């Protein structure tokens, strides 16, 4: 019976424990979406995690939807990330870069006046993140079929640059209502070309992007992030089980290192079915505690557990969980504010 503190092999990478740091947007990058010394220190502080999944990182300027988030399309960004990976490795850690395109969850403010792109011209309900006064999401521009190859190539180049920056692998962000998720789910994908309609067509872009990353890294250093809950950024699918089972089966055929799924503890969870369909290491990610994390591992419904907010407030989360120690409370008002406050100043155990 596995516990959080047992080692695990993901792909060809052996982890000392099953505690994964989930991707966490923190809005601390420098001008030009360049990672900086603050970020290197932040990630190094958390290197005891079995695996760090970096904050979501845009593969193209048109994939940005939040202020001061990092990218992986320029040489300066590669140099900035290189300092991060060196710091994590010096502290004994392992880190994958999460490759990201927000699709319609953006605004011309972030895109040099351009409209966001999406599978279909359907605006998301809600308001643009971290913009005041609040403004609703605009109606995005539907991508032409011929443009989609450029999206795949941007991910492939992002994977190459991640390797140049010293990462241990990459995770494809296919979750939370961003571009690849928008193609996958039928509420946001109304296309009539080979990227829309059937489940096979709607999953095509995610799988092409995965194959592009595999061409750079090999399958054993590629993971995929999914959100079968389908509840972020005005998403929805008419048959979640059928859609996500197809995707996980296809990813399983490719032999990727893992799936990390933000869907694990609700009564209507389909995580067990998806884990079976995938057949490989399955990381659960949804507001876990020490007890609930060990419980899902003991049941065999997940192979590792990703923690998000607890890692923000507890750089030594692994040791705190090991000791059953009290956790620092998070300070949400500092999650996206820049600077060291609420970023580098959480206390560790004495």
How would you label these PLM feature ranges?
Residues 1-350:
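Flavin-dependent oxidoreductase catalytic cores
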């Amino acid at each position: 019976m596995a516990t959080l503190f047992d080692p695990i092999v993901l792909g060809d990478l052996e982890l000392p424990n099953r505690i994964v740091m989930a991707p966490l947007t923190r809005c601390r990058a420098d001008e030009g979406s360049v990672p900086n010394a603050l970020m290197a220190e932040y990630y190094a502080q958390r290197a005891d995690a079995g695996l760090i999944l970096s904050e979501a990182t845009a593969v193209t300027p048109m994939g940005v939807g939040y202020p001061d988030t990092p990218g992986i399309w320029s040489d300066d960004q590669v140099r900035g990330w290189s300092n991060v990976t060196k710091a994590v490795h010096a502290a004994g850690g392992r880190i994958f870069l999460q490759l990201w395109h927000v699709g319609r969850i953006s605004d011309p403010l972030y895109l040099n006046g351009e409209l966001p792109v999406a599978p279909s011209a359907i605006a998301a309900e809600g308001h643009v993140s971290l913009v005041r006064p609040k403004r609703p999401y605009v109606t995005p521009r539907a991508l032409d079929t011929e443009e989609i190859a450029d999206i795949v190539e941007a991910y492939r180049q992002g994977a190459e640059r991640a390797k140049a920056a010293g990462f241990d692998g990459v995770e494809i962000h296919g979750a939370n209502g961003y571009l690849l998720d928008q193609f996958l789910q039928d509420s946001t994908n109304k296309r009539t070309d080979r990227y829309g309609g059937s489940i096979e067509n709607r999953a095509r872009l995610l799988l092409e992007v995965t194959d592009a990353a595999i061409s750079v890294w090999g399958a054993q250093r590629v993971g995929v992030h999914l959100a079968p809950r389908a509840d972020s950024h005005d998403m929805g699918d008419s048959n979640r089980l059928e859609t996500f089972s197809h995707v996980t089966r296809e990813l399983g055929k490719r032999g990727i290192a893992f799936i990390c799924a933000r869907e694990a503890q609700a009564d209507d969870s389909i995580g067990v079915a998806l884990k079976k369909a995938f057949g490989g290491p399955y990381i659960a990610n949804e507001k876990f505690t020490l007890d609930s994390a060990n419980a899902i591992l003991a049941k065999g419904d997940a192979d590792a557990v990703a923690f998000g907010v607890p890692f923000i407030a507890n750089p030594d989360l692994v040791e705190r969980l090991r000791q059953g120690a009290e956790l620092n409370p998070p300070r949400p008002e500092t999650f996206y504010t820049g600077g060291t406050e609420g970023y580098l100043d959480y206390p560790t155990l004495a």
